[in-house]
């Protein structure tokens, strides 16, 4: 059977509002849908199957009678169906945490069929839910999570992440590159879509580094996948360095002959950190860096690797790159550098016409 792209979606707090008083939807009066959930699911419907997965504490007991659950739940399902939204299955754990069952999220017994029969494609399936247990469920399934939040990651934003959006001009071929780099220390694959926004898939084994790479793509206005298996039992040096080399190569290949690009970029955002970036996709690598860090590590990432990452990237991107930042918090200083680099790169790769931005006739 062909593996499918499936969204495993939480119910309370994700599809419908969860009352903060008793955390039970046990009457029609309590049934309220999350903002824009129906338009969002309709947009996602052509690309994904839907499976609802929910913990319902004490369902079927005196504390939560079955009939009290059924009435609003059936009304919710009927409304979804009337709007063209159907779920392949609705999977519910009725137990309380103290019951220590095997089916309560983040445990995976409810989804055993999907695992044993390999019904979902782990590269294109997601868990969507508002709780940390939903994120943990995704980890247990080996897929990615989108932790729903009405402000930070609402249904409109989820659609933006899950459905890549083409940004290329109508008369231009979308710019894409894939680079595979294998050495004795690392095995890396980088895919870059310069004219597409959406969900980035980044797995290097270094959590903080993954987050920083995502900042580059997000603020750069493009999409990328980065997969790296490195010798992390030694340290993260080879992983970070080789990823930078592969990413720079992929960006350079995706840019092609650079015809029509803006080429130059400069950003100076003012936040709690003052980060500054100047870049020229000149075809001549040059790098200058100014930042001081008080700590040796931020999470699992060595602060000294920040400079080395950008130096390696500038070398294979064949770019002139100046970076500096000031601030009090090392986490924020490093993040400001990755963000400002992404924003500057966004300017440089923007297509403005069809002319080559160089008097030499080549970049």
Swiss-Prot record:
Gene: hisB
One GO biological process term: L-histidine biosynthetic process
Compartments it resides in: Cytoplasm
Coiled-coil intervals, chain numbering: none
Pfam families according to UniProt: Hydrolase_like, IGPD
Annotated residues for binding of Zn(2+): 93, 95, 101, 103
Protein name in the entry: Histidine biosynthesis bifunctional protein HisB
Gene Ontology MF: a single term: imidazoleglycerol-phosphate dehydratase activity
Region (Histidinol-phosphatase), start-end ranges: 1-174
Active site: 10 (nucleophile), 12 (proton donor)
Cofactors, names only: Mg(2+); Zn(2+)
Disulfide bonds: none
SUPFAM superfamilies linked: HAD-like, Ribosomal protein S5 domain 2-like
EC number, UniProt record: 3.1.3.15, 4.2.1.19
Family according to the record: In the N-terminal section; belongs to the histidinol-phosphatase family.
């Amino acid at each position: 059977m062909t593996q499918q792209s499936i969204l495993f979606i939480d119910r309370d707090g994700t599809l419908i509002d969860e009352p903060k008083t008793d955390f039970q939807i046990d009457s029609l009066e309590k049934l309220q849908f999350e903002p824009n959930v129906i338009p969002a699911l309709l947009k996602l419907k052509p690309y994904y199957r839907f499976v609802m997965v929910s913990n319902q504490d004490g369902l079927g007991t005196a504390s939560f009678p079955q009939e009290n659950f059924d009435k609003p739940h059936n009304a919710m399902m009927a409304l979804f169906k009337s709007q063209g939204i159907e779920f392949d299955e609705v999977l519910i754990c009725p137990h309380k945490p103290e019951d220590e069952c095997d089916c309560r999220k983040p445990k995976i017994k409810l989804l055993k069929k999907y695992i044993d029969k390999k019904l979902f494609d782990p590269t294109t399936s997601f868990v969507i839910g508002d709780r940390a247990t939903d994120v943990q469920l995704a980890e247990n399934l080996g897929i990615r999570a989108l932790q729903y939040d009405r402000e930070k990651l609402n249904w409109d934003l989820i659609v933006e992440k899950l459905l890549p959006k083409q940004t290329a001009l109508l008369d231009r071929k979308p710019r894409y590159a894939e680079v595979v780099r294998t050495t004795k220390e690392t095995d890396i694959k980088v895919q870059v879509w310069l004219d597409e926004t959406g969900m980035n898939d980044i797995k290097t084994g270094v959590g903080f580094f993954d987050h920083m790479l995502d900042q580059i793509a997000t603020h750069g206005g493009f999409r990328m996948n980065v997969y790296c298996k490195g010798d992390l039992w030694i340290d993260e040096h080879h992983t970070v360095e080789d990823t930078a080399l592969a990413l720079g190569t992929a960006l350079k290949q995706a840019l092609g002959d650079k015809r029509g690009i803006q080429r130059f970029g400069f950003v100076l955002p003012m936040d709690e950190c003052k980060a500054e970036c100047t870049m020229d996709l000149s075809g001549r690598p040059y790098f200058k860096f100014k930042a001081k860090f008080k700590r040796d590590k931020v999470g699992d990432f060595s602060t000294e690797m920040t400079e080395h990452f950008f130096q390696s990237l500038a070398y294979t991107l064949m770019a002139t790159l100046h970076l500096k930042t000031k601030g009090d918090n090392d986490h924020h200083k490093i993040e400001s550098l990755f963000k400002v680099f992404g924003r500057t790169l966004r300017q440089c790769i923007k297509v403005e016409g069809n002319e080559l931005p160089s008097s030499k006739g080549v970049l």
